[in-house]
Amino acid sequence: MLTYETWEENVVSFSEEDETKGALSVLNWAYKEYKDEVVYACSFGVEGMVLLHIINQVNPSAKVVFLDTNVHFQETYELIRKVRERFPSLNIIEKQPELTLDEQAKLHGEKLWESNPNLCCKIRKILPLEKSLVVEKAWISGLRREQSETRKHTKFINQDHRFQSIKVCPLIHWTWKEVWRYVYKHSLPYNPLHDVGYPSIGCEKCTLPVGDGGDSRDGRWAGKVKTECGLHYQ
């Protein structure tokens, strides 16, 4: 089994000559390699809808973890309900932070997402995923190379130093148009915020719509140097 400790580059290759541009091949490998020791960390963005559809074909009882920061858009929570109806056998786990928002405010002050967004992300996203991955050998992410400069070198299979795990990224070669084409073709549910200028959807406090021609990540932590929550540190 390929693990963080036994990491080797290019130990497996994948065919990209199908509708999924390698994603189906990658996921078949991941569930064969790790069985029930792999989890998909899903933010329920539009890429997530594509991955959930393909994962459901490969492993209908797959584990899916959603990092519920308690400050997501209401539209995101409603989408999760629809996904549960569409894919009832998937094991969707809503992972909560240890601190409630009130407890966080007492310890670190009100609106931590404004005063120290890195700490807020650590408390509400990074630490919960870290705890989820303690019992897993690998995790799946919907990163695409096209999304931003920080993601353009992502590979199908990555040695993840942040969580000392294997990170599987099946959608690296997909374009934004291909993601949407797949969603429409398969009549998949998606977050309606995508229709009003939100290409990337995170917490409500830290996500704004993006103007025409903007980077898909421009609406995240707008006005701050920060462009990543920290889950995908390389």
From Swiss-Prot:
Cofactor(s) the protein needs: [4Fe-4S] cluster
Domain of life: Bacteria
Top EC class, one word: oxidoreductase
Reactions catalysed: [thioredoxin]-disulfide + sulfite + AMP + 2 H(+) = adenosine 5'-phosphosulfate + [thioredoxin]-dithiol
Gene Ontology cellular component list: cytoplasm
Cell compartments where the protein resides: Cytoplasm
Pathway the protein acts in: Sulfur metabolism; hydrogen sulfide biosynthesis; sulfite from sulfate
Name under which the protein is recorded: Adenosine 5'-phosphosulfate reductase
Source organism of the structure: Bacillus cereus (strain ATCC 14579 / DSM 31 / CCUG 7414 / JCM 2152 / NBRC 15305 / NCIMB 9373 / NCTC 2599 / NRRL B-3711)
